[in-house]
UniProtKB/Swiss-Prot annotation:
The lineage of its organism: Eukaryota, Viridiplantae, Streptophyta, Mesostigmatophyceae, Mesostigmatales. It holds the Pfam family Ribosomal_L22. This protein binds specifically to 23S rRNA. InterPro entries: Ribosomal_uL22 (IPR001063), Ribosomal_uL22_bac/chlpt-type (IPR005727), Ribosomal_uL22_bac/org-type (IPR047867), Ribosomal_uL22_sf (IPR036394). This is Large ribosomal subunit protein uL22c. It comes from Mesostigma viride. The keyword Electron transport does not apply. It is found in: Plastid, Chloroplast. One of its GO terms (cellular component) is chloroplast.
């Protein structure tokens, strides 16, 4: 996970190569965008989607970066930006009858979450 810092107390964390479709991650990110850190964690804990685990890891990382690098408390953080980008697609083939092979596409994505201080 990479970390960058802006001048106005924003901290960013990125997870690359997550084995999940960007569309499935985007429907979870839309629910937590703009919320406070603690509220977003609670939402992620009770949502029934597989994408919640890597998103919560990135959110934990962004909060740890904010605490370590800027000295911000986790209670004073809010999610200013949450986005997902398409990553490389791994292409595999499934053997089928009579010597055929059907393509299997394994999509990956890149999750970016930026947190900022509320105050």
């Amino acid at each position: 996970m990479n970390m960058t810092r802006d001048a106005d107390l924003k901290v960013k964390a990125v997870a690359r190569g997550v084995f999940m479709s960007p569309q499935k991650v985007r429907r979870v990110l839309d629910q937590i965008r703009g919320r406070s850190y603690e509220e977003a964690l609670m939402i992620l804990q009770f949502m029934p989607y597989r994408a919640c685990e890597p998103i919560s890891k990135v959110l934990y990382s962004a909060a740890a970066n904010a605490k370590n690098n800027l000295g911000l408390t986790k209670a004073s953080l809010s999610i200013s930006e949450a986005k997902v980008d398409k990553g490389p697609i791994l292409k595999r083939f499934r053997p089928r009858a009579q010597g055929r092979g059907f393509p299997i596409r394994k999509p990956t994505c890149q999750i970016s979450i930026t947190v900022q201080s509320i105050k």
